[in-house]
């Protein structure tokens, strides 16, 4: 029996099979490791790699494409990469570095990639944001006009900071730079400000101490800590500040006020120098690569006070720079000074002389903060910077002059008392009303007959007296942030009453 083959039936079966055939075809951009070591990998292939693209190695290590050269791609590793071997494959992910952000980050300690490192479990992020985001444009911003109170009298009176400002904290090691930053975070309690503290290249014990201080003061309730310690790869130390800015940006675009501390950018620049030299990029001044200015400018330009249309949010940046022997003319300090809106200069001489915070009012400046200063503070702080500057000049002159006239002696005496009342203990920020009261007492001669060694005791007692509610001054100034005639009258009465009590008990 012959089998009759019907071509139309066979062709319809083949067509049916073709239509049902569904094999998934994956197109991958794959390369091969040519060389690996010192946190750097050179990869052959990856023709379509983007600058800054995430690359995945066989052992699961992630890298970032940095150098796109003619015959290879230079990548920096975001991990140890001990298992990566020459000849192993690398896959381009098609993604740029991004982290998960959201309310769940508040109160947590994360690494430079937004992963929890505080042992409290994973963080459920509400959305992802690129680590490298463009800064807000000119139209998206408005001028700085709201105060960012640090709680430190010397700063709030002479070098005021506004929301959306970039104010550099600069000084030698062990002069109290981190202390000022931490005090500022503690002072934001109850102000509805989200704070981000970025620790770059620091010892794990130092970061643990900072976190403990913030927890003890109840400041972790509104703070995120981003840590890339000294033992982390240079890549993560380089990325940590951008991660901090990205977290703050999420809240800023939600209409909140944020504060970011970068502690410190000198170490970020050193990490970037290390990466660049290993990638064989040409070195420039102090062996830093030519674009080291750009790594800081693109970071600090992300700080802004947003316009009303964009929700009135703000990001205030307090970058920290460590100087060597007070040399502010070195490469990185001059770069960051030129990018920021002013600097708080901490002097090791003042610190060693027991003047803490060791703020040098002569070199320190705030270029935009005066527009944000509260009316009450503006009224009392106008004279203080000038008086202190004159005191410094007179003090230098008085060392050589044997007999001084009465006016000069009085000015020197007042200068000593002003300097004394600006001294402040660590982790004890003051409210606006307290600061205004002690400054008012200083510039209006209420301390002139108080011995210099008793000034601190007097001001502490005065603050306690005002807070006790005996006098209406404290509540009025705290709510209005202005020193009108009524408030001034109440303050004068309080000063006279307290001074009598103080003199009677002294």
From Swiss-Prot:
One of its GO terms (cellular component) is proton-transporting ATP synthase complex. ATP binds at residues 171-178. Keywords: ATP synthesis, ATP-binding, CF(1), Hydrogen ion transport, Ion transport, Membrane, Nucleotide-binding, Thylakoid, Translocase, Transport. It is a peripheral membrane protein. Its EC number is 7.1.2.2. It is found in: Cellular thylakoid membrane. It catalyses: ATP + H2O + 4 H(+)(in) = ADP + phosphate + 5 H(+)(out). GO terms for molecular function: ADP binding; ATP binding; proton-transporting ATP synthase activity, rotational mechanism. The record marks 364 as: Required for activity. The keyword Acyltransferase does not apply. It comes from the Bacteria. Gene3D superfamilies: 2.40.30.20, ATP synthase alpha/beta chain, C-terminal domain, P-loop containing nucleotide triphosphate hydrolases. PANTHER family: ATP SYNTHASE SUBUNIT ALPHA, MITOCHONDRIAL (PTHR48082:SF2). F-type ATPases have 2 components, CF(1) - the catalytic core - and CF(0) - the membrane proton channel. CF(1) has five subunits: alpha(3), beta(3), gamma(1), delta(1), epsilon(1). CF(0) has four main subunits: a(1), b(1), b'(1) and c(9-12). Belongs to the ATPase alpha/beta chains family. Produces ATP from ADP in the presence of a proton gradient across the membrane. The alpha chain is a regulatory subunit. This is ATP synthase subunit alpha. It comes from Nostoc sp. (strain PCC 7120 / SAG 25.82 / UTEX 2576). The gene is atpA.
């Amino acid at each position: 029996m012959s089998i009759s083959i019907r071509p139309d039936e066979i062709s319809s079966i083949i067509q049916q099979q073709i239509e049902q055939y569904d094999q998934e075809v994956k197109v991958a951009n794959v390369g091969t490791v040519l060389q690996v070591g010192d946190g750097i990998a050179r990869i052959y292939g990856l023709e379509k790699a983007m600058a800054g693209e995430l690359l995945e190695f066989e052992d699961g290590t992630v890298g970032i494409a940095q150098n796109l050269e003619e015959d290879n791609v230079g990548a920096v590793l975001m991990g140890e990469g001990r298992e990566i071997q020459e000849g192993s494959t690398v896959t381009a992910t098609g993604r740029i570095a991004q982290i998960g952000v959201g309310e769940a980050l508040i109160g947590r300690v994360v690494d430079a990639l937004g992963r929890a490192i505080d042992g409290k479990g994973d963080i459920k992020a509400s959305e992802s944001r690129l680590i490298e985001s463009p800064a807000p444009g000119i139209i998206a911003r408005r001028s700085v006009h709201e105060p960012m109170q640090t709680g430190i009298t010397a700063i709030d009176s002479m070098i005021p900071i506004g929301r959306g400002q970039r104010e550099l904290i600069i000084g030698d090691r062990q002069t109290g730079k981190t202390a000022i930053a931490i005090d500022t975070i503690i002072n934001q309690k109850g102000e509805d400000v989200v704070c981000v503290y970025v620790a770059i290249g620091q010892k794990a014990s130092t970061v643990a101490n900072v976190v403990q201080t913030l927890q003890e003061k109840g400041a972790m309730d509104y703070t995120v800590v981003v840590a890339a310690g000294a033992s982390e790869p240079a890549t993560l130390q380089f990325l940590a500040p951008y991660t901090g800015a990205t977290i703050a940006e999420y809240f800023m675009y939600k209409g909140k006020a944020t504060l970011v501390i970068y502690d410190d950018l000198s170490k970020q620049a050193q990490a970037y120098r290390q990466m660049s030299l290993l990638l064989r990029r040409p070195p420039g001044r102090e062996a830093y690569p030519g674009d080291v200015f750009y790594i800081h400018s693109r970071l600090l330009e992300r700080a802004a006070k947003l316009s009303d249309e964009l929700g009135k949010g703000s990001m205030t940046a307090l970058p920290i720079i460590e100087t060597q022997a007070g040399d502010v003319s070195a490469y990185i300090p001059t770069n960051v000074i030129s990018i920021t809106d002013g600097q708080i200069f901490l002097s090791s001489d003042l610190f060693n002389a027991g003047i803490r915070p060791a703020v040098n009012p002569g070199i320190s400046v705030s270029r935009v903060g005066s527009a944000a200063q509260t009316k009450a503070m503006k009224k009392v702080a106008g004279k203080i910077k000038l008086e202190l500057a004159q005191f410094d000049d007179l003090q230098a002159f008085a060392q050589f002059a044997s007999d001084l006239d009465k006016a000069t002696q009085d000015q020197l005496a007042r200068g000593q008392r002003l300097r004394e009342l600006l001294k402040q203990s660590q982790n004890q920020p003051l409210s606006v009303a307290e600061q205004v009261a002690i400054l008012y007492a200083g510039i209006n001669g209420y301390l002139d007959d108080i011995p210099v060694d008793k000034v601190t005791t007097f001001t502490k007692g005065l603050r306690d007296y005002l807070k006790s509610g005996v006098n209406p001054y404290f509540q009025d100034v705290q709510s209005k942030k202005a020193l009108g005639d009524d408030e001034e009258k109440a303050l004068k009465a309080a000063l006279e009453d307290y001074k009598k009590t103080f003199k009677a008990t002294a």
